[in-house]
């Protein structure tokens, strides 16, 4: 009998298996994110190839809960150029998100009671699976955004002043 050799996974392979594919940076500016949830996403083959190539836009995306299912709307996944028109997918189709029933019920209660919204924050690989992180967010008003910008600017000024006097 021959023994099987244990194959060691290198750091570069591990990093490739857990890389971020798309991010919605604008969401963190427009919404105050209260809670996040990692879910799976139901995709077709050409969508998987396109997401892995980085051809995804999360900026206008949002999530809804309809008939007990979590759905992703308005996320643009570009069609593949070399797949032809017959096998390609609709770029803006509604996609089902995969989460446990308890998690969906918890999100549904939060969205209905507090007037919060569900926003896609990022898409990443977890092993060979494509996962999406959605956030429960409360919309920011203009004055909240200005306060945040002032606070960030003050921190930058303080760091630059400390760097000058070192």
Swiss-Prot record:
<feature type="compositionally biased region" description="Basic and acidic residues">
    <location>
        <begin position="144"/>
        <end position="159"/>
    </location>
</feature>
<comment type="similarity">
    <text>Belongs to the SmpB family.</text>
</comment>
<keyword id="KW-0963">Cytoplasm</keyword>
<dbReference type="InterPro" id="IPR023620">
    <property type="entry name" value="SmpB"/>
</dbReference>
<dbReference type="InterPro" id="IPR000037">
    <property type="entry name" value="SsrA-bd_prot"/>
</dbReference>
<dbReference type="Pfam" id="PF01668">
    <property type="entry name" value="SmpB"/>
</dbReference>
<dbReference type="GO" id="GO:0003723">
    <property type="term" value="F:RNA binding"/>
</dbReference>
<feature type="region of interest" description="Disordered">
    <location>
        <begin position="143"/>
        <end position="166"/>
    </location>
</feature>
<comment type="function">
    <text>Required for rescue of stalled ribosomes mediated by trans-translation. Binds to transfer-messenger RNA (tmRNA), required for stable association of tmRNA with ribosomes. tmRNA and SmpB together mimic tRNA shape, replacing the anticodon stem-loop with SmpB. tmRNA is encoded by the ssrA gene; the 2 termini fold to resemble tRNA(Ala) and it encodes a 'tag peptide', a short internal open reading frame. During trans-translation Ala-aminoacylated tmRNA acts like a tRNA, entering the A-site of stalled ribosomes, displacing the stalled mRNA.</text>
</comment>
<dbReference type="GO" id="GO:0070929">
    <property type="term" value="P:trans-translation"/>
</dbReference>
<protein>
    <recommendedName>
        <fullName>SsrA-binding protein</fullName>
    </recommendedName>
</protein>
<dbReference type="GO" id="GO:0005829">
    <property type="term" value="C:cytosol"/>
</dbReference>
<keyword id="KW-0694">RNA-binding</keyword>
<dbReference type="InterPro" id="IPR020081">
    <property type="entry name" value="SsrA-bd_prot_CS"/>
</dbReference>
